[in-house]
Amino acid sequence: MSNGHVKFDADESQASASAVTDRQDDVLVISKKDKEVHSSSDEESDDDDAPQEEGLHSGKSEVESQITQREEAIRLEQSQLRSKRRKQNELYAKQKKSVNETEVTDEVIAELPEELLKNIDQKDEGSTQYSSSRHVTFDKLDESDENEEALAKAIKTKKRKTLKNLRKDSVKRGKFRVQLLSTTQDSKTLPPKKESSIIRSKDRWLNRKALNKG
């Protein structure tokens, strides 16, 4: 009896050991499968994240490109504005210079005597006739516009030279400018010099006794 009982216990323990071993093997198999599942899911998640990262990178590059283009457009616009402003300043400076020259010429003309102004007008009339004759010639050559501008500049330059020469013979006294006459003009424009004999005769006549002034 005892020997059979011992044998039964041994068989039972062996069976238990075999069952435990089988369970351990099952656990190992399950754990391996879990690892495989986890690893496969990680790979899938990595594959899913890759397009997102690529999308973010491409979106960032596109935004940076748009910012760069916008900055270039702003720089170009600023450059055009500076160029436009510079041209406007140059035009304004030219106009201001022309106005100042015109004002100076008008002041000089206003300070000159009427006789000299008449001489200038006569010279201008002669220049106008000369320019009209040249204008007809240039019309024949189909260059009227350019030549008219050249003639206008020539007349203006000649007029300035005339005024400049006239200013040499004038002296400014306070707010007025006095024209100095040449020796050839003295006898025509200045009054005659006083004669002492004539003055004495006039005084005697005015102070004669017949008047009885006393």
From Swiss-Prot:
The protein's location, in the record's own words, is: Nucleus, Nucleolus
The record's section on InterPro entries has: UTP16
Quaternary data: Part of the small subunit (SSU) processome composed of at least 40 protein subunits and the RNA chaperone small nucleolar RNA (snoRNA) U3. Interacts with snoRNA U3. Interacts with MPP10.
* Skewed-composition ranges (Basic and acidic residues): 1-10, 22-41, 54-75, 192-206
Q: What does this protein do?
A: Functions as part of the small subunit (SSU) processome, first precursor of the small eukaryotic ribosomal subunit that coordinates the first two steps of ribosome biogenesis in transcription of the primary transcript pre-RNA and pre-18S processing. During the assembly of the SSU processome in the nucleolus, many ribosome biogenesis factors, an RNA chaperone and ribosomal proteins associate with the nascent pre-rRNA and work in concert to generate RNA folding, modifications, rearrangements and cleavage as well as targeted degradation of pre-ribosomal RNA by the RNA exosome.
| Key words, A-Z | Nucleus, Phosphoprotein, Ribonucleoprotein, Ribosome biogenesis, rRNA processing
Tell me, what is one Gene Ontology molecular-function annotation carried by this entry? U3 snoRNA binding
Q: Which family does it belong to?
A: Belongs to the UTP16 family.
An annotated GO cellular component:
small-subunit processome
Q: Where is the PTM Phosphoserine found along the chain?
A: 16, 45, 65, 144
The misc remark on file is: Present with 2120 molecules/cell in log phase SD medium.
Which coarse location class applies to the principal site listed for this UniProt protein? nucleus
Q: Where is this region: Disordered?
A: 1-106, 182-214
Q: What is this protein called?
A: U3 small nucleolar RNA-associated protein 16
Biological process GO terms, please?
endonucleolytic cleavage in ITS1 to separate SSU-rRNA from 5.8S rRNA and LSU-rRNA from tricistronic rRNA transcript (SSU-rRNA, 5.8S rRNA, LSU-rRNA); endonucleolytic cleavage to generate mature 5'-end of SSU-rRNA from (SSU-rRNA, 5.8S rRNA, LSU-rRNA); maturation of SSU-rRNA; maturation of SSU-rRNA from tricistronic rRNA transcript (SSU-rRNA, 5.8S rRNA, LSU-rRNA)
Acidic residues bias (residue ranges):
42-52
